[in-house]
């Protein structure tokens, strides 16, 4: 089984990265063997969308006219059995660099599926997705909703939790001190649930 995680923070060793790693570790405890890869947005090149999507994306399924790391990261997502998306909240939104990635991928999918002459099914369709959000001074639920909207728009299946905040792992400030969202506990729950969802999908596909 293969899991691919994306840390949307501009810092590679802080709370978002820690919680994404904890979800992966929980998956490792729940299933074996597990091949895991985590990439950091801060270490990748994601240019802003140039709005060439209507003429280009409509005729090039799920590809972008701009050549950078967006295509490589999308390919890793497509190849994975499960995806983890993690991001902090900056000013009412995730970091601009990570948002550029989200915007580019969403545009590829939207314009191919709505403008393209041929309809190629989403290559991300049905892939289980776990969500992680961190907010220092506000509620992380806004970022969870943001990630949930993106993942469903491209066809992935966000894995929900049985307890608050339901959409994924949320943390308010330092996760070690957060007794409301209980991020470390939720990370373990999400990893186990994500492993089950990925295994069920593989079994259904005869993998």
Where are these regions (language model features)?
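Cofactor-binding loop segments of dinucleotide-utilizing enzymes, especially the Rossmann-like FAD-
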Residues: 8-9, 41, 133-136, 163
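Short, well-ordered secondary-structure micro-motifs
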Residues: 49-50, 142, 171
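N-terminal beta1-alpha1-beta2 submodule of the flavodoxin-like/Rossmannoid cofactor-binding fold
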Residues: 1-110, 114-115, 177-207
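Short beta-strand elements in bilobed, periplasmic/extracellular small-molecule ligand-binding domains
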Residues: 33-40, 156-166
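A short acidic, helix-capping loop that chelates divalent metal ions and anchors anionic groups
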Residues: 168-175
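Short, glycine-/small-residue-rich phosphate/pyrophosphate-handling segment
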Residues: 114-161
């Amino acid at each position: 089984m293969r899991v691919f995680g994306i840390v949307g923070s501009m810092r590679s060793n802080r709370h978002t990265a820690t919680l994404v790693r904890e979800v992966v570790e929980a998956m490792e405890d729940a299933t074996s063997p597990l091949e895991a890869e985590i990439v950091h947005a801060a270490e990748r090149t994601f240019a802003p969308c140039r709005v060439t999507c209507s003429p280009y994306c409509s005729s090039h399924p799920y590809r972008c006219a701009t050549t950078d790391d967006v295509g490589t990261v999308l390919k890793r997502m497509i190849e994975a059995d499960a995806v983890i998306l993690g991001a902090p909240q900056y000013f009412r939104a995730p970091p601009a660099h990570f948002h550029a990635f989200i915007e580019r991928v969403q545009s590829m999918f939207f314009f191919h599926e709505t403008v393209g002459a041929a309809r190629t099914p989403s290559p991300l369709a049905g892939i289980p997705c776990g969500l992680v959000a961190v907010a220092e001074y506000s509620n992380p639920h806004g970022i969870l909703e943001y990630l949930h909207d993106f993942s469903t728009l491209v066809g992935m299946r966000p894995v929900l939790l049985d307890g608050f905040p339901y959409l994924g792992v949320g943390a308010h400030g330092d996760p070690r001190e957060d007794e409301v969202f209980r991020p470390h506990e939720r990370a373990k729950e999400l990893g186990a649930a994500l492993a089950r969802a990925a295994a069920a999908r593989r079994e259904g596909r005869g993998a």
